């Protein structure tokens, strides 16, 4: 007889060969990395064509992800075979979160999302600015069980703590596990960084018997090793994921759904626009004159190029050191100051500091030293391992850098230890976690007019008065087959939050386009798709268009 035990995973015994094959087929998915390599005509040797989301243990039992439960039950029904099932969940300690703060009355879509998660665990999708954290707090208030809230950054950890203290009047002392702290609080709500749990598995063992609810914030990160090694170990009866961008660039969102549960609710973005919950920005493309040779014969025209490929990194290096491009951007940042507080988003920490230096000089020349600027980033690494196409290149680069190279058997590729910053840059630009927190707080309090930021700002940065955004480095958006522009969606979301102090807030987003370089031009086209998907009116493409800053401001859009 078939036997099924539901816990942090699903254990199945007594199955037939046909049943096993059916389940295995369900949980074997095409490997996006393999498909990407084939698209780019890159070597696929050593890359698995498929990924297995199931395994068998030493006793022969099938071990399946807990998010597969609904589909497994359908399989059992379809086969019409007798079975017995059991659960090994932790209901968790019953707790009283006190009264809900009525200053945070939920809108209809928020109530519907919470109700959907109460009915069944799984993933809920809601755009940035829709109140995901508030909805999460309402959910745990309704559940009344000891809760673990998982985040992937310390900044989100503290923002979540502030929301909990504002909404849950009886939450008591909130536990914090991260940022060097190991405080369990009163045990009602514990907010933890996955990095801390990953490094301290004993904490997971200590929490497992008492935690009945697990919230995975920014759940699209679940496929990362940190989440798989932490969240997937909890036996909590209720696990839910919250995210604004479920689709991942690497195509591994299936891991999220299988690890947490099916998609249970999607908040419609159109309704948020209708009720003023999101501000629709004006998008303006600013065309640069930057030109360079393609990154390489292989990757030059590939929209997927990037990451740790040495050719692409070299191309980006040329871009950020192009003085004419930097000057154009800096001038536009200064010209846009009257439109409101701004965030300047770059993939490169170095570019943030370079642009800030130019902007500060322009402001000083115009007698506008009262305009305050700051740079915030997620941290610096002096060196990083980068991919080389072959051994000869790796050896040559390592000699040039005065570092080392290696062959990674698991990845089947050569890597070079590549300097990211000079010693002076590293010492001048690095900031502590405390300093980063202080900068973000100053920006939140309106003490900073122009904030230069790296990937830190993609998620969770909650500064409602930001009304101007500058996307200053090329990045990929949505492709023809997938919604892979999650990073861009997160970034533009920073200026789409309504400002309670400015009900008439208008927002403008500057996208700097380097259309003389093939790969950057293709990335520009994919970004247009993201804007359209978000319901934003996009200016028409003009083959010969070269918008200048002066032309734009003469149009008097505002």
What function would you assign to each model-found segment?
Residues 52-54, 75-78, 84-125:
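Conserved pre-motif I regulatory segment
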Residues 119-143, 452:
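Walker A/P-loop
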Residues 146-157, 316-359, 531:
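Conserved strand-helix element at the start of the C-terminal RecA-like helicase core
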Residues 155-180, 361-368:
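Conserved helix-turn-beta segment of the N-terminal RecA-like "Helicase ATP-binding" lobe
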Residues 158, 173-185, 199-202, 343, ...:
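Conserved helicase ATPase core of P-loop NTP-dependent helicases/translocases
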Residues 212, 220-284, 531:
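Post-DEXD/H (motif II) to motif III coupling segment of the RecA-like Helicase ATP-binding lobe
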Residues 258-280, 291-295, 483-489, 497-558:
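A conserved SF2-helicase RecA2
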Residues 380-386, 419-533:
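Conserved RecA-like P-loop NTPase helicase motor core
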């Amino acid at each position: 007889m078939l036997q099924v035990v539901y816990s942090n995973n699903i254990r199945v015994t007594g199955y037939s060969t046909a049943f096993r094959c059916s389940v295995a087929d369900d949980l074997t998915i095409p490997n996006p990395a393999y498909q990407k390599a084939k698209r780019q005509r890159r070597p696929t040797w050593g890359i698995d064509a498929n990924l297995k989301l199931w395994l068998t243990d030493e006793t022969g039992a099938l071990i399946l992800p807990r998010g597969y439960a609904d589909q497994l039950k359908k399989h059992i029904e379809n086969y019409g075979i007798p079975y017995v099932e059991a659960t090994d969940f932790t209901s968790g300690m019953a707790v009283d979160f006190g009264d809900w703060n009525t200053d945070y009355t939920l809108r209809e879509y928020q109530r519907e999302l919470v109700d959907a998660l109460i009915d069944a665990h799984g993933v809920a999708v809601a755009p940035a600015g829709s109140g995901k954290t508030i909805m999460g707090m309402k959910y745990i208030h309704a559940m009344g069980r000891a809760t673990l809230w998982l985040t992937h950054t310390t900044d989100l950890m503290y923002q979540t703590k502030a929301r909990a203290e504002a909404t849950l009047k009886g939450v008591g002392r909130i536990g914090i596990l991260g940022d060097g702290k190991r405080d369990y609080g009163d045990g009602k709500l514990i907010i933890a960084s996955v990095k801390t749990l990953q490094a301290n598995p004993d904490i997971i063992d200590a929490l497992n018997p008492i935690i009945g609810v697990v919230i995975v914030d920014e759940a699209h990160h679940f496929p990362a090793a940190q989440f798989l090694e932490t969240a997937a170990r909890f036996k909590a009866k209720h696990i839910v994921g919250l995210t604004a961008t479920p689709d991942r660039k690497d195509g591994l969102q299936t891991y999220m759904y299988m690890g947490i549960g099916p998609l249970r609710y999607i908040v419609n973005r159109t309704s948020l626009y209708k009720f003023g919950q999101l501000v629709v920005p004006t998008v303006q493309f600013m065309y640069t004159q930057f030109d360079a040779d393609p990154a390489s014969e292989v990757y030059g025209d590939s929209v997927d190029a990037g990451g740790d490929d040495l050719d692409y990194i070299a191309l980006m290096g040329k871009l950020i050191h192009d003085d004419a491009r930097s000057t154009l951007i800096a001038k536009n940042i200064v010209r846009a100051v009257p439109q409101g507080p701004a965030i300047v988003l770059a993939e490169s920490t170095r570019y943030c500091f370079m642009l800030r230096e130019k902007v500060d000089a322009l402001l000083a020349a115009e007698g506008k030293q009262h305009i305050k600027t700051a740079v915030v980033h997620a941290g610096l690494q002096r060196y990083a391992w980068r991919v080389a196409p072959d051994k000869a290149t790796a050896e040559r680069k390592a000699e040039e850098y005065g570092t080392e190279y290696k062959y990674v058997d698991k990845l089947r590729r050569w890597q070079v230890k590549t300097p990211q910053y000079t010693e002076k840059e590293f010492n001048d630009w690095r900031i502590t976690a405390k300093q980063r927190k202080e900068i973000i707080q100053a920006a939140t309090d309106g003490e900073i007019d122009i904030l230069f930021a790296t990937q830190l700002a993609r998620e969770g940065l909650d500064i409602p008065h930001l009304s101007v955004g500058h996307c200053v480095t090329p990045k990929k958006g949505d492709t023809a087959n997938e919604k892979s522009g999650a990073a861009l969606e997160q970034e533009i979301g920073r200026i789409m939050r309504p400002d309670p102090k400015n009900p008439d807030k208008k927002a403008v987003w500057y996208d700097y386009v380097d259309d003389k370089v093939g790969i950057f031009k293709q990335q520009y086209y994919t970004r247009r798709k993201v804007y359209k998907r978000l319901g934003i009116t996009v200016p028409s493409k003009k083959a010969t268009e070269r918008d200048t800053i002066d032309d734009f401001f003469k149009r008097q859009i505002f």
